[in-house]
């Protein structure tokens, strides 16, 4: 294994992680907001049966182990990217596994918001959309950034497991060389590189979460 091989594997892991997180955010953020706003006491109450179905679907997707989920979504992966093997193919199961997790993280962050802030906005005649976009999300931004950082670091771990289906990245190298060929030194290097990636993402995420916290800027 050369430095170029490790560098390309790091790039593949970074590419898959960032894209999967972005797609998970696109799906998970609105869903997480809906779980809070759609409550019977929320700013945009939805039918109880619909909220019940959403919660069940999220819980089911979150409860399936990632390796099994990858196999279960093979038909969906093939329909979207045309193959079930390779770096791009791993993005689909990663998104399916991560967006329910993101939705729960968003829900948790939004539920920590003081109800008085929302009530004040309602008393001033703000619409549900205005309350969500100009009150709930901005007020909970530090928590949301922290949640996205958690999701990002979790997806790094998932991406390593995707090496089982030839997903590329550090996971594939660790599996192909470290496990199948018993080259423990290569596996250790891959683990160290994954740990460093997690540390970098976590540090950057924590910095921006702190930077966006209005309470700490006073």
State the predicted function of each range.
Residues 34-72, 94, 99, 104-108:
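Cytoplasmic-entry segments and transmembrane alpha-helices of multi-pass inner-membrane transporters
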Residues 34-41, 187-218:
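C-terminal transmembrane helix and the adjacent membrane-cytosol boundary/short C-terminal tail
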Residues 1-20, 47-55:
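Periplasmic/extracellular loop-to-transmembrane helix junction in inner-membrane transport proteins
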Residues 110-140, 167, 180:
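Short helix-to-coil transition segments within interhelical loops
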Residues 158-188, 192-193, 213, 218:
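Glycine-rich helix-loop "coupling/hinge" segments at transmembrane-helix boundaries
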Residues 18, 128-159:
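Transmembrane alpha-helices
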Residues 8, 12-16, 59-62, 66-99, ...:
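Loop-to-helix entry region at the N-terminal start of transmembrane alpha-helices
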Residues 7-38, 148:
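Transmembrane alpha-helix signature in integral membrane proteins
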């Amino acid at each position: 294994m050369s430095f170029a091989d490790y560098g390309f594997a790091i790039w593949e892991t970074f590419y898959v992680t960032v894209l999967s997180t972005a797609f998970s955010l696109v799906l998970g953020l609105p869903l997480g907001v809906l779980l809070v706003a759609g409550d019977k006491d929320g700013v945009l109450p939805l039918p109880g049966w619909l909220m019940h179905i959403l919660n069940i679907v999220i819980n089911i997707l979150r409860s399936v182990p990632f390796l099994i989920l990858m196999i279960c979504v093979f038909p969906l992966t093939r329909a979207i990217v045309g193959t079930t093997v390779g770096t791009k193919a791993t993005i689909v199961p990663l998104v399916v596994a991560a967006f329910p997790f993101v939705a729960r993280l968003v829900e948790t962050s939004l539920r920590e918001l003081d109800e008085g802030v929302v009530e004040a906005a309602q008393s001033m005649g703000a619409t549900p959309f205005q309350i969500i976009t100009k009150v709930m999300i901005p007020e909970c931004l530090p928590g949301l950034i922290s949640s996205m950082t958690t999701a990002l670091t979790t997806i790094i771990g998932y991406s390593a497991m995707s090496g089982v289906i030839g997903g590329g990245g550090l996971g594939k190298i660790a599996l192909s060389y470290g496990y199948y060929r018993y080259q423990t030194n290569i596996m250790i290097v891959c683990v160290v590189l994954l740990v460093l990636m997690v540390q970098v993402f976590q540090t950057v995420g924590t910095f921006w979460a702190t930077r966006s916290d209005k309470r700490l800027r006073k």
